[in-house]
Amino acid sequence: MSAVRRQVRKRRGGVVAVRDQDKPLFVSVDELVSYVTDGDRIGVGGALLTRLPLSALHALAARRPKELQYISWGGGIPLEILLGADCVAKIVFCFSSLDIFGLAPLFRRALEEGTVQYEEWPAFAFTAALEASKQNLPSMPFRVPRGSDLLTNRSDIARSPDSSVEVEIGLAPRRDLDVFVMHAQRVDEAGNVEICGARGMDTLAVFCAHTVLVTAEEVVPVGELGHLRDSFVIPRDVVDHIAIEPYGAYPTSCLPHYIADFACLADVTSVSPPPVPPRPTGAASERIREAPTLTHQRIRETVAEVVAARAANDAPPTIDEIMVCWLAQRISNESICSAGAVSPLAVTSYLLAKATHAPHVSIMMTSGGLVDIALRPMLLALGEALDTKSAPVQCGGEDTYRWYYQQGRVTCEVVASAQIDRHARTNNIEVTSPKGRRVRLPGQGGMADVADLHRDFVLYQTRQSTLSLVESVDRVSASRAVKSASERETAGLVPGEIVLVTNLGCYEYDMASDELVLASVHPGVSVEEVRAATGFELRVSDHLVVTPLPSPATLRVLRDEVDPLGLRRLEFVSAQERTTLLAECIEAEEDLIARALHWV
């Protein structure tokens, strides 16, 4: 199938080029990726475990183009596939992990061994660089995250004369893409492309690329697109080639066609690089395709049935439950809470608050793409499906950055950090092991920006030790630079707090001494135990208390309604234990889906 194409003038390396009208619009996946050439600057669509163009990337890896520059907010599975085929010479990114499945091994090895070049960007600077390309400008202003050292020695990023003492403005140079590869739910016969649900950075990056390559679940007649709630239609004028590829995002999700297959994801992420997964068939195919039809009410009913069939849990609260409940108590009806990547503990605390004392809290999920979700249980693949049904606002990550983050509207984004020092500076970039080895971490994502912008800077560690709570971090990925109420008001920010909760106790930040102070110890924990697990001289509050235990009623809601699978526990166990626990949670969710669909 082909179509008569309209001439469109697009940029490549500063030179205006004319698209070749004679090349076919609809092609095979193998032909689609043949348009990627050695040295291309390539961007990848989707977000986290949502709508990743994995079929196209596996086909691209099989061709083994060389010297690619991978330019994307996130790395994850797409970057692992391309690194495994030795395609990548440079990475421009904000964050890279395998989400709930752990660290990204090839990304870590490449940066630790120096086999690829890389640029690590704060999220706002990265989106500003893409926005400059989208608007055909040389640069775009952004608020410099003053509490991070990410931009230290970055001569390519100038400072604006509009900077002030309170607000430093940087100028991000434009970032053009030679190729953008994405997966979509539907396209029409003319080449218009429709995406639904959380958009990642797709609606920004697609307008920065010289060549746009799309795989899609299905093709429909002209006039069919744009009628689904919160869908976004990319005009055919910016789309170059399309391959119709059912399951083109599998085993990640492509709603409403199918949810993510977490069992398959566990298999492919356990191998490096991730292999091509077998196409789902039989019951597995039916499960992921039928699950998006399930309603909140049906899931609540099924959870209640499952809970009623198991033994009552009257055990005392565990440390994960104490931490979740403490975090939830910080949330009110007026709160706006954003969920970062790989944060089961944080999301559980938001949902617990919504289920108990703060029913009107607004929660943003899936990289900010799903805003103000309805209450639902803490789940894996089903969580995104339910959130997509309920979120009244579905947008791109850059949209929530502008609408919420830069406006200072977000109350908190509860975030974990591998290293935190006495001054509440965090490090998710890299650490040095006790043996002196450089250990690469996933990166800060957007922490560098939100440390100042959100009202509260809320941190957590689930396994406090002298290696994680240190005198001084090896790198400062994020910290709050604008601290006092007067400074924050002058900078147009909401005054707030800096707090840390660990598996041993809770800390508050004392501005006068610029340090974290132990404010409470968890039940059964002594100050001496905390001191022994702290890498700096511990200061204890004169008003030290014991962290309150959650009430029996709150515990029941947490265990039976909010987190019946126990996903909050995933952040409290070793890597080996995590694999086993995650497998149990995946199996439990698959059973839940089967019951909800009346299969058992």
What are these regions (language model features)?
Residues 79, 366-377:
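Short connector loops at secondary-structure junctions
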Residues 67-69, 334-337, 514-517:
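Short active-site oxyanion
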Residues 46, 223, 319-322, 334-340, ...:
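Flexible, glycine/charged-enriched surface loops at secondary-structure junctions
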Residues 254, 283, 542-596:
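A conserved C-terminal secondary-structure "cap"
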Residues 4-33, 48-62, 78, 87-90, ...:
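Conserved phosphate- and dinucleotide-binding cores of soluble alpha/beta proteins
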Residues 25-29, 49, 313-324:
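Cofactor-pocket helix-loop regions in the catalytic cores of large enzyme subunits
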Residues 42-44, 49-64, 322-369:
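N-terminal low-complexity or amphipathic/hydrophobic leaders
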